[in-house]
Design a protein with these regions (language model features):
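Short C-terminal boundary/hinge segments that cap the last helix of small helical domains
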Residues: 41-59, 124-143
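Short, basic-rich loop-to-helix N-cap that marks the start of a DNA-contacting helix
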Residues: 25-39, 108-121
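A short, Lys/Arg-rich alpha-helix, primarily the initiator
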Residues: 1-17, 54-83
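Residue-level detection of the helix-turn-helix DNA-binding "recognition helix"
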Residues: 38, 52, 81, 95, ...
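Short alpha-helical DNA-recognition segment
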Residues: 3-29, 84-103
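Residue-level signal for the short linker/turn that defines the boundary of a DNA-recognition helix
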Residues: 17, 28-31, 42, 74, ...
Length: 143
């Protein structure tokens, strides 16, 4: 496994999972979804209502817990290639974000943050776009 893939896995894994368990369980993105909604001044209910209204065809179950790690990795790589972002740039961005988050949360007495948000930031993509990409890959529309 190359260092980029390892760093990506460790970033996803940074809070709450041991790597041996990650391969057996699906990654839960609830904290990321809450953070994204808060960033835009809305609630999770509003988010799902918006998705239904716009016919994005992403169910609540898919958004929260139906994203196995291999699918997440494929989506990250697909977006990275499409946007022509180097693995080095993503790695560097994740490292800088980790440092910034740790400084902020250490001052609050906690480091409970969504590490997945750092990957979205590094790819410069919002959660909805990421979920749509996952669905396209899952349905075989994108390799």
């Amino acid at each position: 496994m190359d260092s980029y893939t390892n760093k990506l896995l460790n970033t996803i894994d940074y809070y709450g999972f041991k790597m041996s368990k990650v391969k057996k369980v699906e990654f839960v993105m609830l904290s990321t979804l809450e953070r994204e909604c808060n960033n835009y001044g809305s609630s999770i209910d509003e988010f799902f209502h918006y998705m239904e209204k716009k016919d994005f065809l992403i169910s609540e179950e898919e958004a929260l817990n139906a994203l196995p790690l291999p699918l997440i990795m494929k989506a990250v790589d697909s977006i990275r290639r499409e946007k022509n972002i180097s693995k080095h740039t993503i790695s560097r961005t994740m490292d800088m974000d980790r440092s910034n988050y740790q400084k902020f949360y250490k001052s609050k007495g906690s480091i409970n943050f969504s590490s997945f948000t750092r990957i979205l930031n590094a790819l410069d993509v919002d959660l909805l776009s990421f979920l749509s990409r996952c669905r396209d890959i899952k349905c075989g529309l994108i390799e």
